[in-house]
Amino acid sequence: MPSETLWEIAKAEVEKRRCHGSDGDGMEIGEKSVFFIGSKNGGKTTIILRCLDRDEPAKPTLALEYTYGRKTKGHNTPKDIAHFWELGGGTSLLDLISIPITVDTLRTFSIVLVLDLSKPNDLWPTMENLLQATKSHVDKVTMKLGKANSKASSEMRQRMWSVMQKDHPDRELIDPFPIPLVIIGSKYDIFQDFDPEKRKVICKTLRFVAHYYGASLMFTSKSEALLLKMRGVINQLAFGIDKSKSMCVDQNKPLFITAGLDSLCQIGSPPVPDSDIGKLQAHSPMELWKKVYEKLFPPKSTSTLKAIQDPARDPQYAESEVDEMRVQKDQELEQYKRSSSKTWKQIELDS
């Protein structure tokens, strides 16, 4: 009997993995995916490059970017592969969230939400819009997965709650994000010079949001020590390296809190006088924290937040021939609009 070809061996391996995955018996996934979302110009690309040891300048992310990294577990073992996705444009391209997260990839995914601490007025709407859009899509995909593979869907729910110990006092008061979530506050070097009361509100608010969603929370900057900590957190998501158990909740220092280690008791109540809490009329703890936060940091208009420069006019992506043709077509379009407008006016006059 002739030996199998390389193609036949590869095909058999794929079929074996597919069958193994459909059994839903707690398979260990070798390839993982990390999806970076967050503030526009918040430092997502820089974080990815740092995690991958790539010494190259960070370029603005136009829409949805992809890259990957490899890591060797040990001698003579195949390298683990991690897929890195990045959503550009802040909150302006929410529709693209659905592209990388599918039924086939859902169980490999983790989310990293990068928030620019130097722009506190944009922080809540950016966080809220991105998390809501991501959760909505993940919930839909999870439902599809449940119909095709109920055991795998059940395992995802168990993993979702595994960040919180069974005897944790807040277990009944939180709503874990459906897939692993890390919240990174970037540009701490600017944030540390803020007024202490403003820092206190931002720190307590982010601690509450992270705890409510069962997420890890950390602040980072250009500091080498903070970058190493951040890299360790991302490597844990991408390659399954052990979680750090260290913790820092001092608002005068960069926060570092692993998922499940914080508590509502430690976080405390929203930083507002007790006499004002009753006036806020919130229907949930999350809404209460939002109202308190936005009282101090009123959000800018949504149109400002969603504004994005026309990539066709960005000099970074200049293409002389394409740009000349674009100008010509724009002129033709304007002429057509004027011509059509005259035609309709003439029809109205004739009638």
Curated annotation (Swiss-Prot):
UniProt keyword annotation of Transmembrane present: no
MF term (GO), any: dynein heavy chain binding
Disulfide bonds: none
Biased composition (Basic and acidic residues): 323-335
GO biological process annotation, one example: intraciliary transport involved in cilium assembly
Renumbered residue ranges of the record's region Disordered: 304-335
GO cellular component: apical part of cell; axoneme; centrosome; ciliary basal body; ciliary transition zone; cytoplasm; cytoplasmic dynein complex; microtubule
Subcellular location: Cytoplasm; Cell projection, Cilium; Cytoplasm, Cytoskeleton, Cilium basal body; Cytoplasm, Cytoskeleton, Cilium axoneme
Keywords: Cell projection, Cilium, Cilium biogenesis/degradation, Cytoplasm, Cytoskeleton, Developmental protein, Dynein, Microtubule, Motor protein
Domain of life: Eukaryota
Annotated coiled-coil segments of the chain: none
SUPFAM superfamilies hit by this protein: P-loop containing nucleoside triphosphate hydrolases (SSF52540)
Self-association and partners: Light intermediate chain of the cytoplasmic dynein complex 2, a multisubunit complex composed at least of eleven different proteins. The cytoplasmic dynein 2 complex consists of two catalytic heavy chains (HCs) and a number of non-catalytic subunits presented by intermediate chains (ICs), light intermediate chains (LICs) and light chains (LCs).
Described purpose of this protein according to its UniProt entry: Acts as one of several non-catalytic accessory components of the cytoplasmic dynein 2 complex (dynein-2 complex), a motor protein complex that drives the movement of cargos along microtubules within cilia and flagella in concert with the intraflagellar transport (IFT) system, facilitating the assembly of these organelles. Involved in the regulation of ciliary length.
Family: Belongs to the dynein light intermediate chain family.
The protein, known as: Cytoplasmic dynein 2 light intermediate chain 1
Organism taxonomic ancestry: Eukaryota, Metazoa, Chordata, Craniata, Vertebrata
